A protein has these predicted regions:
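Rhodanese-like catalytic fold shared by cysteine-dependent sulfurtransferases
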Residues: 2-10, 15-52, 61-93, 102-140
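Structural scaffold elements adjacent to functional motifs in cytosolic proteins
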Residues: 54-56
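Short, surface-exposed ligand- or partner-binding patches at beta-edge/loop junctions that are enriched
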Residues: 96-97
Length: 140
């Protein structure tokens, strides 16, 4: 009886190790929603960090009308949106926003699926940023 218990215990230990090793190789995406004050702090902390990217996923027209300084534009409505995201480096940290939080909320599962390491979503989009009094720049 003891021998059977030891065999079962050993088999369970081996399965636990194998399962643990399998999960360790996949990078999990860290997604966090932040308000405008937290987003501003992130931008200030990473001002000179080439591994920090501000990503505006609104249309090019919305982007030109006003965006967060330093942001790059990838249009959520573009037919190749997912492919454009897939071309971006996955190991950088991203602050993502749209107009109201709707598009960025829909985009978060895509970031996860593509294996991005760390993504911050601006809650309620650029509207919340603007209403909080933070600056916007216009043009390209």
């Amino acid at each position: 009886m003891k021998r059977k218990s030891l065999v079962v215990l050993f088999a369970m230990a081996v399965l636990a190790l194998v399962a643990g090793c399998g999960g360790a190789s996949k990078t999990e995406t860290r997604i966090q929603q932040v308000g405008p004050a937290e987003a501003y702090q992130l931008i200030q902390q990473h001002r000179d960090d080439p591994d920090f990217v501000i990503l505006d996923i609104r249309t090019p027209q919305e982007f030109v009308a006003g965006h967060i300084q330093g942001a790059i534009n990838v249009d959520f409505y573009a037919p190749d949106f997912k492919q454009q995201l897939d071309q971006l480096p996955k190991d950088k940290t991203y602050l993502v926003y749209c107009n109201s939080g709707n598009r960025s909320g829909q985009a978060m599962p895509i970031f996860r699926e593509l294996g991005f390491r760390e993504v911050y979503e601006l809650k309620d989009g650029i509207q919340s940023w603007y209403q909080a009094g933070y600056p916007l720049v216009s043009g390209q």
